Amino acid sequence: MNDLVPLSSLKVGTTCKIDSILTDEHMRRRLLDLGFSSGTIIKCVQYSPSGDPIAYMLRGTIIALRKEDAGDILVQEGGGHAWD
């Protein structure tokens, strides 16, 4: 089993599966509404020139998150396609 890492630590091109979201209820609800839920396959697609925000592909959509918010999402690297 792979170790869990923060979503914000992924390199461009890395695909992973969301394990958990460790943030306050308001932000958790917002992330869930955007499709960031446990078991979702997600891919890091681009860093902005300054490194923040970071763009991720999940469920056929590209969404940018602030590095701070992405750090609250724990993922398991490997497998799957971000567009599944």
Residue ranges of model-derived segments:
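Generic secondary-structure boundary/loop-capping signal
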Residues: 4-7, 28, 62, 70-72
